[in-house]
Design a protein with these regions (language model features):
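C-terminal alpha-helical cap of glycosyltransferases
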Residues: 119-144
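Residues within well-ordered alpha-helical secondary structure of globular protein domains
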Residues: 26-29, 97, 132
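Donor nucleotide-activated moiety binding/catalytic core segment of transferases
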Residues: 1-39, 44
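Catalytic binding pocket for nucleotide-activated donors in carbohydrate/polymer assembly enzymes
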Residues: 3-7, 36-115
């Protein structure tokens, strides 16, 4: 229905490529089903999302028995809006609101702070770990 009602144009693209980082970089907003791409787009590119109202079966996951909701489901309403059959006709207004309302920018900032530990230190920490591991392994080899 969305693709039919909103055909591709110079301003709108329905991209289904496997390598999607270039289109994500160019986009102002993402309308998506439930997927990890939502967080790539929103947290890496600092842009809002509209996500589909989907049922999530957590029974295959290790934490299926937890009574608290997964972080993902508490973060989604802070970074964008849920698209349902009831509000589908308001999609244009939802897009405008997600782009313009500062609460979504604030929500993205909060989500980044909650997920990115040691921001800017990833390479340094990985190299330090690998060097430490190498040193440990070479010491064991030398002792034999």
């Amino acid at each position: 229905k969305i693709i039919r009602d909103y055909p591709a144009s110079d301003q709108l693209e329905c991209n289904q490529d496997n390598d999607n980082f270039e289109v994500l970089r160019r986009a102002d907003i993402l309308v998506s089903d439930f997927s990890g791409i939502i967080f790539d787009f929103s947290l890496v590119y600092d842009k809002p999302v509209i996500y589909a109202d989907t049922e999530f079966d957590n029974s295959p996951y290790d934490a299926w028995w937890l009574d608290t909701p997964y972080w993902t489901f508490t973060a989604l309403p802070r970074i964008g809006q849920k698209l349902t059959m009831d509000n589908l006709d308001s999609l244009r207004e939802m897009i405008d609101e997600c782009i313009q309302d500062p609460k979504y920018a604030k929500g993205r900032q909060e989500a980044r702070e909650e997920t990115w530990e040691y921001k800017g230190e990833g390479t340094k920490r990985a190299v330090e770990y690998l060097l430490d591991k190498y040193e440990t392994l070479t010491q064991v080899t030398e002792e034999k």
